[in-house]
Structure formats: C-alpha cells, structure tokens
Amino acid sequence: GPFTIELSVGSDTEQIYYTLDGSRPGSGTNLYTVPITIESTTILKARSIGTNTLPGEIMVSTYFINEQSYLPTISLLAEPETLWDEDIGIYENEFKQREIPVTIQYFTPETDHGFTANAGARLGGLNIWTKPQKPFTIYTRNRFGQDFINYQLFENKQIANFSRIVFRNGGDDWEETLIRDPMTESLVSGMMDCGYMAYAPSALFLNGAYWGIHNIREKFDTHYFFENFNVNPDNIDHLEYTSTPSGTQLLVIEGSMDHYNTMINYILSNDLNDLAVYNQIQQWMNVDSFIDHLVMTVYCANTSWGHNREWWRSR
C-alpha cells in the first residue's frame, strides 16, 4: 500500500531536489520540503544542491507497489525527452544509432536488489526495433561510471562481468511466444560446439511503467569471447554477416578478414574430395562447429539465416 519517504541532507546550506518521472533532478525540479507519498510504482531520483558546493550524486530508487512478478525485474530509467521527444527521442523516432544515458536497476524474483548501473542504451536489432515494444542494447562505458556490470545474470553460465547486454523483445517471435530464439539456443547448451547467447526472461519497467517481458541476452563482442572461451579479446578476428543499405555484407567487427579470405579462396580453388585439402581446411576452421551451426539452422527453420551470422577465431 501507500507509504512515505523521508529524505535528509547533512548540511544546512544544501537542499534536496527530486523527480518522479525519470528526469534529472536540479534546481528547477521538485524541492523536497515534506515526506514524499508513494501510492503506485514510482521511480525516485534525488540529489542535494548547495550554493557554494558541487551538486551531490544523483540517488536512484524504484518502488514497486502491487506489482507481482515471478521473473527478474528490470527498472530502466532515462530522461523522458531522450525517449519520447518528437525530435530527439529514440523510441518516438526509432533512432537506432543514437545512444542515451540510462540507469538500470535489477531485482531478483524475490524482489532483492541485485545491482544498479549507469550505462548507455540504443535500440537494437535489424528489423525488430520497428515493433511497438523495442529491444535495447546496453553499453557500459567509463564515461558513465563503470566498465562492467558485475553480476551473474544467467544461471547456466558462471559469468559475472558484462560490458554489453541486450534486453530483447523476442525478435521475429514478438507476436507469438517471445521464446523461440532462446529456446533454440538452449538446445545447443552443453550439446554442440557452438557459441550461444545465454538467456533469462525479465519483466521490464520503463521509467516506472510496465513495458512487458524482455529477454536478457548476452551480446557477441570481445568481452563475450574472453568470458566464454578465455581468449585474448585483443587478438581475435570477428566477422559478421549483416544487412546494410546496400545489401547483406560481411563486415569486420574485430581484427581483419585476411585469414577468412585466404581460406575461402583456397576452398574455391581446390577439390574438397582431396583429403589433404580437407585436412588443411580443418586446420583453419572448426568444421564440427560449422556442421553444428548448419544442423541447428535447418532443424529449427531459422528465418534470419541471410544475416545474423557471425564467425570468430583466436589469432
């Protein structure tokens, strides 16, 4: 039910300002004078401001009232105009390349607070960002105050450092179950020699408003390869087939394409029935992993096979 919150500051020369809509508190926002009554799910940002001192750190809290979830809960906070403004809002205008500062608060199904992190957020995906419920890619950066999210997000992976995570909307399965992609990847776990992105469903609140189920996913990046395969992130080639305005292209994410081009040219120029040729290819690539990839693509009727394909190797 409703309750009140009391705020205090240690100096008589400072005052507390607060907001309840996700915006940054400042001298032009609400001045705290009496306890704040909380009657429904609310996000509170508060900071102290004095005449001869630097403004205090912004304190963030999310209060859930009569909200029940059996899933982990994400509270995603951002300046409202960075989301909804008709000129600059990334949600309003479907701006994919614009990155906005956000605060993330994570709560376990038992409502325990897991972590709070300041980060950047962009709309993610190739086409799925056009859905009414959009995916977010989260980027930790030094300028936001931290390089990693230090928390174990996934039960089936003993990893507790993330520089990128994705709050996915279900992708091509958005209108249906939201779980086809993570369910398919769960079949790979422990069974095939393929990298896969871990998955955990969550209930996401955007500036205090319930925003539906979003799947927490890993993201393929240099830190992913370090944590999952214990390889030097500065010494890999990482390539991705993705769609661009000029069509589907193979792009270099990390390293170079030299080794890949050498291998492809060798394959096109030689007879794979020759055992010596095949043995050479096995030295250059993990053939079993590639077979597993093809098996899953066909068996699970992958509808995004024209893109969303990534290769990597440790140099």
Regions of interest found by a model, annotated:
Residues 151-158, 162-177, 209, 215-302:
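ATP-dependent phospho-/nucleotidyl transfer catalytic cores
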Residues 2, 33, 41-43, 60, ...:
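Extracellular structured ligand-interaction cores
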Residues 190-205:
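Short, well-structured beta-strand/strand-turn elements
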Residues 136-158:
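Reverse-transcriptase-like RNA-dependent polymerase core
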Residues 207, 296-315:
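Zinc-dependent metallopeptidase catalytic helix centered on the HExxH motif
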